[in-house]
């Protein structure tokens, strides 16, 4: 029973975008590379995310319901079973994921079979799990839109503080001090371990991107990367 999932970003236009900046358009200019990489100018401000090109539906915001509906429609037509929200940097973007989950439920109520959704955590994983549990899962919001594995909502996260602290230490984050997850939370989810491409191979890992070819099998999960991270 094979299923297909896609990594899904929530942060386009969120939470502090000041405009739409197109790296492809900049590079077409005579001094575009210098503007993009070495200048802090209005057409390419430091600290702002840049589109690599103009998207199909224009320079959109991830919270735009019209765009979300088009995205879910295409995923349904492609036969995608689930999407995995990127909350790997300890931001959960509830103003966006609630819109996506509401659209999924609307399609369900109309008789369609849209992909369900799960979350991927990494930095400050345990704290992010707690936030998601309190924001979404404990109150049972949009429950029919949750992607479930082995009868429980799937979440990609650490289950203990030791690997979470080790990840923070790699980034020089010595102030992070997470409490252990409660038995209630540990029992609520089906957990998969975050698998970063430069980490050792984890048989139970859930990779969001893969740098190895042929792609390794992590238990029952294989990642097929069709477009890699811009820093690679």
Task: Indicate residue ranges for each PLM-predicted region.
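Glycan-processing catalytic domains of CAZymes
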Residues: 1-232
């Amino acid at each position: 029973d094979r299923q297909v999932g896609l990594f899904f970003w929530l942060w386009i236009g969120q939470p502090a975008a000041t405009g739409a900046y197109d790296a492809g358009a900049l590079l077409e200019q005579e001094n575009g590379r210098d503007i993009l990489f070495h200048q802090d100018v209005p057409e390419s401000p430091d600290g702002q995310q840049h589109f690599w090109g103009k998207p199909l539906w224009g320079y959109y915001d991830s919270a735009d319901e019209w765009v979300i509906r088009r995205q879910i429609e295409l995923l349904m037509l492609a036969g995608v079973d689930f999407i995995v929200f990127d909350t790997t940097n300890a931001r959960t973007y509830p103003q966006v994921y609630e819109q996506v989950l509401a659209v999924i439920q609307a399609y369900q109520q109309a008789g369609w079979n849209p992909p369900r959704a799960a979350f991927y955590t990494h930095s400050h994983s345990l704290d992010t799990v707690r936030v998601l549990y309190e924001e979404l899962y404990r109150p049972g919001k949009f429950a029919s839109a949750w992607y479930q594995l082995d009868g429980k909502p799937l979440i990609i996260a650490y289950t203990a503080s030791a690997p979470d602290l080790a990840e923070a230490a790699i980034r020089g984050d010595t102030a992070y001090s997470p409490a252990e997850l409660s038995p209630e939370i540990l029992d609520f989810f089906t957990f998969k371990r975050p698998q970063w491409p430069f980490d050792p191979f984890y048989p139970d890992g859930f990779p969001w991107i893969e740098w190895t070819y042929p792609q390794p099998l992590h238990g029952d999960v294989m990642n097929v990367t069709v477009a890699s991270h811009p820093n690679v």
